[in-house]
Amino acid sequence: MKQLFYLALLLLGSSHLLANNIEVNNVSLTGQNTTDGFTLVQFDLSWENSWRISVGPANWDAAWVFVKYRVNGNLWQHATINLTGGNTPGGAELDVADDLTGAFLFRSADGTGNISWTNVQLRWNYRDDGVDDNALVDVQVFAIEMVYVPEAPFFVGTGFNGDEIDEFFTLAQFGPFFLRNPYQVSSEAAITVANAAGSLYYDSTVQGGDQAGPIPASFPKGFAAYYCMKYEVSQDQWIGFFNTLTQTQKEGLDVTGPLGKNTDDEIIRNTIAWPDGGNATTTNPNIPLNYVRNEFLMAYLDWSGLRLMTELEFEKACRGTLSAVGNEFAWGNSNIHNAIYTYTNEGLPNEQIADPGSGTGNAVFQ
């Protein structure tokens, strides 16, 4: 797959959270080829609750894997992965991104359960990255769980049967009147933006857009297949990113500083601490990251080889190919949980909501 982006949360009707527990172990370099200037980055990869299904939603989960390297203990850099030449164990499929920043690893056939793959190999073209054959190199392999969203038409907005703020709609004539209906995205072609029948439009009352158009064909609309993140960014994933940065970069992206929670102490389950001159740590590695400013988010995505998702892609990921429901949330209906959650195994990889409710979304807000 070629399109990558971040999704803060995607639960799609799940009644409880299952920890991802994605792990990369036993990283090594092997099979150096000094003629062509490449080596193989070898590692083991595992995660829980994996699936692939060819009917119904026809989707699967995957790991987005990328490599960072440094030469002689200097700055960490992003490794260039070759389109071909990698190796996968039985039952695994490898798809390297067109921009060579990383690769997707996923099931090659339908199935469910936990993944545990050993001796996965990616071909790193180190000479393309300006690394000498005899350089002393450190490498790190990072992995993020993703979900494949297949190509399909879908609807945005809920039309006259909802009262969302600044939602998408299209006008449809009903006798002497015009009604607001959901707008169907049926291709990646340019979309006309206008307050007219058959066009996409939206109000602009609360930090909305400029209502200008058209939306160009090159803009990701969600019709074509894409990947999105399965879970929120965890505190452990953030630390993995943060600890590869320079001192100056860390100071500008410090969630313990004035632009974040402004303390090394725990606040709202954020236990990230960054002692001066050291590496950041957390005692809640599996808990989602909070105190995230937009510039923090964009820096993490750029470092990961990902991009922000578009609003159109977000609605496709939540709704799929189903018809619109008035006032619906991301889980497909207008019901929200009306009580404070309690947890089992709080703070552990197998943490779960003990009282999720039935037919309600995983949210409590005012």
In which residue ranges do the predicted regions lie?
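Sec/Tat signal peptide C-region and signal peptidase I cleavage site
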Residues: 15-19
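Short amphipathic, basic-aromatic surface patches that mediate peripheral association
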Residues: 44-57
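Extended low-complexity, serine/threonine- and proline-enriched intrinsically disordered segments
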Residues: 57-86
